[in-house]
Amino acid sequence: MSLDTKTIGKIAHLARLEFDDKSLEAFSTDFNKILSWIDKLNEVNTDNVEPLIHMSHELNVLREDIDKVTISHEEALKNAPKKDSDYFRVPKFLS
């Protein structure tokens, strides 16, 4: 499949793109190369190929999520350079 410059100009207009004549010619060449590559993909026989949901059959193996206390709130606040009651104090970073 190949499109002429006039058709590509109409498509560009619908997409609200503006090209000068030289750029439109270059874009037309590139666009037609992409379309010819897609035509080659359409020639591939995929009769016995199942559609893919994922690119890989690999699964994520995750550990079981177990709730446990590793450090208490008070211990965490002991290491804080600044604190306010039960909260960490941090420098303001919004301008």
Curated annotation (Swiss-Prot):
It comes from the Bacteria. GO terms for molecular function: asparaginyl-tRNA synthase (glutamine-hydrolyzing) activity; ATP binding; glutaminyl-tRNA synthase (glutamine-hydrolyzing) activity. The keyword Nucleotide-binding applies. It catalyses: L-glutamyl-tRNA(Gln) + L-glutamine + ATP + H2O = L-glutaminyl-tRNA(Gln) + L-glutamate + ADP + phosphate + H(+); L-aspartyl-tRNA(Asn) + L-glutamine + ATP + H2O = L-asparaginyl-tRNA(Asn) + L-glutamate + ADP + phosphate + 2 H(+). Keywords: ATP-binding, Ligase, Nucleotide-binding, Protein biosynthesis. InterPro entries: Asp/Glu-ADT_sf_sub_c, GatC. One of its GO terms (biological process) is translation. Allows the formation of correctly charged Asn-tRNA(Asn) or Gln-tRNA(Gln) through the transamidation of misacylated Asp-tRNA(Asn) or Glu-tRNA(Gln) in organisms which lack either or both of asparaginyl-tRNA or glutaminyl-tRNA synthetases. The reaction takes place in the presence of glutamine and ATP through an activated phospho-Asp-tRNA(Asn) or phospho-Glu-tRNA(Gln). This is Aspartyl/glutamyl-tRNA(Asn/Gln) amidotransferase subunit C. The lineage of its organism: Bacteria, Pseudomonadati, Bacteroidota, Cytophagia, Cytophagales.
